[in-house]
């Protein structure tokens, strides 16, 4: 659904799923546009960088292409596949699944003693990047948490599909089950690296 016709103000980032450079946009009705401009510039914004503006223009142009719609559909397919695969491994999805690029996972069903902080740290060692996240009625502090948040935009851009989501769920579960075994985590990290080697982020780059 498109919020623009219904909301007075719409904000979004130009990075993340839009795949542009770091930044953001504010869309508004004409009635409050000048107030927003005055609030943003020059107090909170200044020194525009032309190369970043150019990169945003490219991102917007790509978003207008039919291929971007296909990319968005593949993101949702991958997110749902990852959600199903994680559920098969014993994790609980807070919302029972997902309709977008994000998954919020309650770790307690998988391991009551496991915290989001610990999961984030050991998964990072194993080559799986995510972040700790609070869940509804979380008994732990926001710095510790009982959940983690996962996204699939990056791996989808790199060309991974639903089969790879099953592998990612498997890596995640195995790392967490063996989190006290450094050698086992390092061995799984090599498997993760082998998978990623088939999907380089910049396949046409000549830089090594």
Predicted regions and their residues:
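Conserved PLP-enzyme active-site core in the AAT-like
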Residues: 1-90, 152
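Short acidic (Asp/Glu) and glycine-rich catalytic loops that position anionic groups and cofactors
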Residues: 33-38, 57-64, 97-104, 145-152, ...
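Flexible, glycine/charged-enriched surface loops at secondary-structure junctions
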Residues: 47-50, 67-74, 86-97, 179-189, ...
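Generic non-transmembrane alpha-helical segments
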Residues: 81, 85-89, 118-126, 169-171, ...
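Conserved PLP-binding catalytic core of the aspartate aminotransferase-like
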Residues: 92-159
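PLP-dependent enzyme catalytic core of the Aspartate aminotransferase-like
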Residues: 142-208
């Amino acid at each position: 659904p498109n919020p623009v016709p219904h909301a007075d103000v719409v904000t979004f980032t130009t990075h993340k799923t839009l795949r542009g450079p770091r930044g953001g946009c504010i869309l508004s009705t004409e009635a409050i546009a000048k107030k927003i401009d005055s609030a943003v510039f020059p107090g909170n914004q200044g020194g525009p960088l032309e190369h970043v503006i150019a990169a945003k223009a490219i991102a917007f142009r790509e978003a207008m292409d039919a291929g971007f719609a296909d990319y968005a559909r593949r993101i949702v397919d991958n997110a749902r596949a990852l959600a199903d695969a994680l559920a098969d491994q014993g994790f609980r999805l807070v919302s029972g699944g997902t309709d977008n690029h994000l998954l919020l996972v309650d770790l307690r069903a998988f391991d009551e003693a496991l915290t989001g902080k610990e999961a984030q740290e050991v998964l990072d060692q194993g080559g799986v990047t995510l972040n700790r996240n609070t869940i509804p009625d979380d008994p732990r502090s926001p710095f510790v948490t009982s959940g983690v948040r996962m996204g699939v935009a990056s791996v989808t851009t790199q060309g991974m599909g639903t089969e790879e989501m099953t592998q990612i769920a498997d890596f995640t579960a195995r790392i967490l089950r063996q989190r006290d075994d450094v050698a086992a985590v390092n061995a799984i990290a090599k498997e993760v690296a082998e998978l990623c080697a088939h999907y380089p982020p910049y396949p046409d780059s000549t830089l090594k």
